[in-house]
Amino acid sequence: MFKLLVLSCLLALALPSLAEVGWWKTGQFYQIYPRSFKDSDGDGVGDLIGITQQLPYLKEIGITATWLSPIFTSPMADFGYDVADLKGIDPIFGTMEDFEALLARAKELDIKIILDFVPNHTSDECDWFIRSAAGEEEYKDFYVWHTGKVVNGIRQPPTNWVSVFRGSMWTWNEQRQAYYLHQFHAKQPDLNYRNPKVVEAMKDVLRFWLRKGAYGFRIDAVPHVYEIPADADGNWPDEPRNEAVSDPEDYTYLQHIYTTDQPETLELVYAFRDVIEEIDAELGGDDRVLLTEAYSPLEVLMQYYGNGTHLGSQIPFNFELLAKISYSSDAYHYSELIHNWLDNMPEGQVANWVFGNHDQSRIGSRLGADRIDACNMIILGLPGVSVTYQGEEMGMTDVWISWEDTVDPQACQSNEQEFERLTRDPVRTPFQWSDEVNAGFSNASVTWLPVASNYKLVNVKKERGIALSHLNVYKQLRALRDEPTLKQGDVSVTAIGPNVLAFKRSLAGYKSYITLININDDVESINLDSVFTSITTQLQYVVVNDKSVRRKNDLTFANSVLLLPKEAVVLSTV
């Protein structure tokens, strides 16, 4: 006997005809964190030549495009997100010639290269900032400056605004005799997008890399780009308190109503998309794309797609699953979050699915190692774009790093009691290629972050040889995405009670595919005839994980599918 509770709302999402589907609309995107992917020169830090050497691996796992975290010239205060030369390659990663060789090899393998673009700020070592601090007329207003306010004879920052990296958003510059704004690190001064020259300068940076051969950009930290306009006297209001937080240095101490998600932000995204369209017209070939990072309310995110008049980001990252799913989430929660995106997405747009990135705890650590395959089934089985962070395909997990060895500035600016809550180092450790020294990442005596202690058990070489390893399950799921049903079929998503997430992909004239995920530790018996319509009496197992006693091509009756604890499978009609 079993309970069958079906979420009432099933979604039938009509997708465009196959002829209308561009390369990215059903693409597999893969994030590379260059410092940690592959070290070719033995300095303990990954580089462009290392990435080029390993591009065949991306081809092996079916990747369509890879976006690289920043590779530009930087003093590395925030590991490349503090850019000093927006048109240069940092020597730690290689040379412009190395980048061009990477582009050429990627083209041979039909893999698109996407670059990380950081619009909110530059490094304080950027020539623009140096000139702005010196008061040069051309660059005087490239950044956000204010002389502050004097209280009881003491000069203070102009507002109470708190940085993402703790402490005041304002730092005093002796040369300029003024405070400059930095929403992040003090070495990351914010650009002033209310100056049209800044907008044009950044659009020119986009053009430069697109003409080099990049196929688009992942745009970093978009909600922070604009602050509320200053009043007639050039001043801004303080932000209100968040009464739930007592630490005045912590970013969450304030409600950031004046420093995030300002309406002009969307207009800037649309302007960046205009550049994409301009270069598409100039160079031709496959479409170039924008991916935007914003942990913003859903109603704001949907506007990133465009407003009916202007085109926006083709791929505004969907962080519903990444940010809101927890270890204790039930199937209803998974289904609700999937529906949140699909039900609110503007007509004609493309969904995307993300479970990991370089800022968030890895799937296996956050949700449990026995849910890794399930999460990959979700991102690779639902319609639209899948996004995988390096190592998630083989089940890499977070690495504990001591306070003494922590290098992430977000954590280093805290203290020994707080750093573990803030550090991103555990998800950025070297990629695990093999059971050789340093997991095959580097032959250096010391790597920039320590290698995971489990690398001899979890690595590409070992998992290639295990039939139901995370890597091989991922590759099977990826191969299945080439089926017409998964490229252009409808989708229905539901929870079958609290433990089982189910979704069906269907297309007239082709097999239907049903994904079943047992999130918890109960044995479940499912009558799919009462869940989905138009399925055959018997179903065939197409993909199984290592919790299953079934094997590929086994048959089962639709009215009595047995799911073991944490089992995740894909079935097809026969």
Swiss-Prot record:
The record marks D359 as: Transition state stabilizer. CDD domains: AmyAc_maltase. Glycans are attached at N120, N307, N443. The keyword Hydrolase applies. One of its GO terms (molecular function) is alpha-1,4-glucosidase activity. The active site is at D220 (nucleophile), E293 (proton donor). Residues 1-19 form the signal peptide. GO terms for biological process: carbohydrate metabolic process. The keyword Glycoprotein applies. Its EC number is 3.2.1.20. InterPro entries: Glyco_hydro_13_cat_dom (IPR006047), Glycoside_hydrolase_SF (IPR017853), O16G_dom_2 (IPR045857). It is an enzyme of class 3 (hydrolase). It catalyses: Hydrolysis of terminal, non-reducing (1->4)-linked alpha-D-glucose residues with release of alpha-D-glucose. Keywords: Glycoprotein, Glycosidase, Hydrolase, Signal. It holds the Pfam family Alpha-amylase. Belongs to the glycosyl hydrolase 13 family. This is Maltase A3. It comes from Drosophila melanogaster (Fruit fly). The lineage of its organism: Eukaryota, Metazoa, Ecdysozoa, Arthropoda, Hexapoda. The gene is Mal-A3.
